[in-house]
Amino acid sequence: MNHKILNKLEQLVHISPQLLRQPNTLRHAIQSTFDIELDEIEYSHMGELVDRIDDKVLDNYFRNHWQAEMKKYKYSGLKLIDEVNSLNPRRVLDIGCGYHEFKGKIDNLVGIDPYNDAADLRVKLLDHHPDEKYDATLALGSINFGSTDKVFAELEHAVSLCNTGAVMFFRVNPGLPHDESDRPVGKNHSNWIYFYPWDANFIVNCAEQLNVDILDIKTDSHRGRIYFVWRTK
């Protein structure tokens, strides 16, 4: 759950509890606060509403404002093209492929992304259930959002999509906000995104729990991101 959104939503209804009984007014307040569009307000509990808002915030940011910076990463950027191809993979999954920059460069690649039309499949990772498993995966900034239970569930599902011996490449965020210093005040579209605070201990503990080998962990060359590589058993 995105606690930044939850706390703001709680603040809104604490100040104006009538919003809980006025769905249209609540919808307008949410749209104005989070700069998103909601067709209707239907939820059984506050956590469900928070998840809907969070998904809309991510959709708005990655569809309309996010810019790729693949060339700026020493380890988790374009270097991966040769590294992945050297594995001779039968199938490769790019999780959260964005503009699908590796398409046509990495062999046998399938790109999934819920927010970008360039993807082969417009689907979230947890909703991706292919008929065949993968020999390699890329998750270069896509498993970065939400609480620990969500991040771990995505890691667990990614591992489940892999054949034995598959190599999994990751770039993760240690909890730093995206730099939008060039935008006017009030137009920082990543304000409401919760960036998960990855660290080496979490990576090691997850690897142990998911029964995968760690091949590499290092800090990449741009924005303090962490690059790591797993291999399934």
Per-segment meaning from a language model:
Residues 2-128, 169-233:
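Class I (Rossmann-like) S-adenosyl-L-methionine-dependent methyltransferase catalytic domain
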Residues 138:
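A conserved beta-strand element that flanks and buttresses the S-adenosyl-L-methionine
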Residues 142:
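Hydrophobic adenine-recognition pocket in adenosine-nucleotide-binding enzymes
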Residues 145-157:
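A short, conserved alpha-helix within the catalytic core of class I
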Residues 157-160, 205-206:
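Alpha-helical scaffold elements within enzyme catalytic domains, especially in hydrolases
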Residues 162-168:
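Short glycine-dipeptide loop
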